[in-house]
Amino acid sequence: MSEQITFATSDFASNPEPRCPCILLLDVSGSMNGRPINELNAGLVTFRDELLADPLALKRVELGIVTFGPVHVEQPFTSAANFFPPILFAQGDTPMGAAITKALDMVEERKREYRANGISYYRPWIFLITDGAPTDEWQAAANKVFRGEEDKRFAFFSIGVQGADMKTLAQISVRQPLPLQGLQFRELFSWLSSSLRSVSRSTPGTEVVLEAPKGWTSV
């Protein structure tokens, strides 16, 4: 009986480059309806376009998307070369705690796949964008974020769109939550793609000095 080769295993065999995984954790609750969700969708297109311009990032950066309102894996981990931005629609409430837990589980599972296939990897990034407050229990998820950061299992970033509960975000993320200026999603994703490209050009395990956020937030 022939052994089946999964897509992931085949991908690792054809591309043994170290991986730089990033999960976008996106709030698509009802309050994002209208211009906010449209600008978010446009930002995702900018994100892909800028990654496409970097041949090394195409091989090394992997992207996943988890949306919440309700929690849904919009995009399992895939290479930047195979990333096609979904068109997101706003609906539902803001189950942020469950969404964070899902993203953390996806990151740990992907790291297991890397190790099983002999693929080195950079510390995963989890990038939360929200315009509201959690409508579910989030404290357990926050504890997991803090423990994971302490153990350097991932780097967790949080961005607050206008209306976001920044005080709660500060209790979830070790790093200071950053407010998005207006609806500057394209500028935000341009910075994110630049940061991931910088990381992907480094050696796994080394510290990378990131470009200071500008044009989309006030620090």
Curated annotation (Swiss-Prot):
Residues 21-199 form the VWFA domain. It holds the Pfam family VWA. Transmembrane segments: none annotated. It comes from the Bacteria. This is Uncharacterized protein YegL. It comes from Escherichia coli (strain K12). The gene is yegL.
